[in-house]
Every structure is written in structure tokens, then in C-alpha cells.
Amino acid sequence: MKKTLVALAILTAAGSANAGINLYDADGVKTDLSGAAEVQYRQTFKEDSDAELRMDDGDLAVNTTVAISDSLNAVAAVAFEFEDGKVTNDELWVGVAGDFGTLTAGRQYMLADDAGVGKDYELGGDGIDFVQANGDQVVKYVFDNGQFYGGVGALITETNPDNNADEASVYEGRLGARFGDFDVRAYLYSGEDVNTDNFDVFGDDKVNVDIDGYQIEAEYIVNAFAFAASFGQVDYELASDSSQKIEADTAALAGSYTMNKTTFAVGYTYWSPEAKGTVKKMEEANVFYANVTQQLHSNVKVYGEIGSSDTDNSEFGYVAGMEVTF
């Protein structure tokens, strides 16, 4: 009962905190609650599509850290995602953390989920896509000493949605370094029997593909300006027939300027797929976008974005949205 009362008191007092709400902090145990809600009015690039009010994002997470000793902590998290009218438990993991880094295991997002330098909200086009970026059987290790950082991860096995005999497996790595305001990093990714419906050019709605790729990224911040660039290559090979594949090059440029609580950003994304075998040819894409974000509060922002793609049968896109976090 005492813990409950303390949690309620802190919940009330910390309602405006932008890094989550501290529910409990005593006896070496710290527990935080965080969440986000985001709604947009969006017109996509798709030709003849109608603008729609879209529930873009809803998240709720509880994270805890327990001090086992002066140099070792136990960590855990449970998180839920609200999307398409459904509630999904997208994170449930445990681990240990210390000066050596953090080692976690369970249902969680992989390092590949962080890849990308775009400053867009919705209209940035197709950038790097490693397809499988989370799973139930993920083991991940990350390390960061301030200047150098890195990590390795593995999706040990993941039964495909169709419950067939093939199970996906993924191995990945990230290595980066910071030199003052300059940050450079690289991602490596290799997956087998990854189930996806992203590529109808293979002839089926859903197929299993083997994926191998990399992404190199760089970011530089000078005063109120931020610049970013990336280049990556990914091969998508049909698991049942290695002669059928897509080799894709992707690149991105982005920049932003922040003035008080307003941020202006522009960006460009390039996507160039090359089909091999009898795979249907895919279209090259050049996408440009611009947006402005107004930070009304440390927990509240509103934004507007416009974008244009040179692909066939595409039209001008726009987005207006609002996000509230706690």
C-alpha cells in the first residue's frame, strides 16, 4: 500500500515531466512509466487516395532498474503499442547492465530499428529497409562509453505468421563513434527466411526472403543547424530460389534549423532497386520533403509536412499532426 501511495503522489507531481513519470524510486528500485499519443491528418503519395484522419502512434511502457550491487543492475521493460484498433505487447524483456554495457533478452526491437537519418514524419519515401527489426526471441548487447558505441543482436528463431516449417533468423551489428559534434556509424544485417509482403514483385502476397545489407550514416551538428547523410545497400533474395532477387541502393540527405521552439527540416531520399532473374522490375524513386515542427511544450509538439515523389501514379502529399508524450 505504501508503494502505491508513493507512486500516486509522484504521478501527480510529475505530470509534466518529458522523460516519463517516475512511479517508484527507493531501496535500489526505480520504475518509470512513459507513453505517447499521435494523431495526423494525412494525404499520401498514392494516386486518387483520400486524405484521412489517422491514429499514427500510441505507446505505453513501464521500465524498471534494480540495483543488484554497486556495479550491476537488473533491467526490464514491458511496452504496448496501440495501432489499427489493436493493442499489441511489442516489448517484454529482461537483462543486466553495468559499465560493461547492457545485455537484454526477450521481445524487443533490434539495432536495425534505429537505422536511418531521415527527418521526415511520413513522406520521406523508401529508405533503408531491413524488414525484420523486432521479434520475440531477440538477444541484444549494446555498449556506449560516450565516444565509441556499438552493439550486436540476434533474432534466434521466429516462426513465420503462416506457421510454416521455416523459421526466420537474423544477425546484426552496429559500430559508431562521436568526435565532438560529428557522429558516424555503420549497420550490418543478415537474415534468413524473413517473411514479408513488401515485395509483390516476387509474385506472391507474402514470401520468405534472405536479406543481407549494410548502412553507413553520418550526422553533424553546428549551432542551430543539423545535417545528416546515409548510404546503404540491401539484397533481398527469394529463399526458395536464389536466382530471384532484388539488389537495392538507397541514399538520404537531410538538414534542419532550430530557432527557439521551431524546427525547419528538409530532406531527400533515393531508392534504386535492380531486379534479377524473372522478378518484376521495380521503379526507382526520388523523394523530396519539407516540414516544420513547433514545440508547444516539452511534452507537446505540432507539425506540418509536404512531400513529392517522382514515381509513376503518385501525387503531392501532405501531413499535419500533433503528438503528446508523458
Curated annotation (Swiss-Prot):
UniProt GO cellular component terms: cell outer membrane; pore complex
UniProt keywords, alphabetically: Cell outer membrane, Ion transport, Membrane, Porin, Signal, Transmembrane, Transmembrane beta strand, Transport
A single GO BP: monoatomic ion transport
Disulfide bond sites: none
Record localization: Cell outer membrane
GO molecular function, one term: porin activity
One matching Pfam family: Porin_4
Signal peptide residues on this chain, from the entry's feature table: 1-19
Annotated membrane topology: Multi-pass membrane protein
Induction field: In response to elevated hydrostatic pressure.
Role noted for this protein: Forms pores that allow passive diffusion of small molecules across the outer membrane.
Family: Belongs to the Gram-negative porin family.
Subunit structure: Oligomer.
This protein's name: Porin-like protein H
Underlying gene: ompH
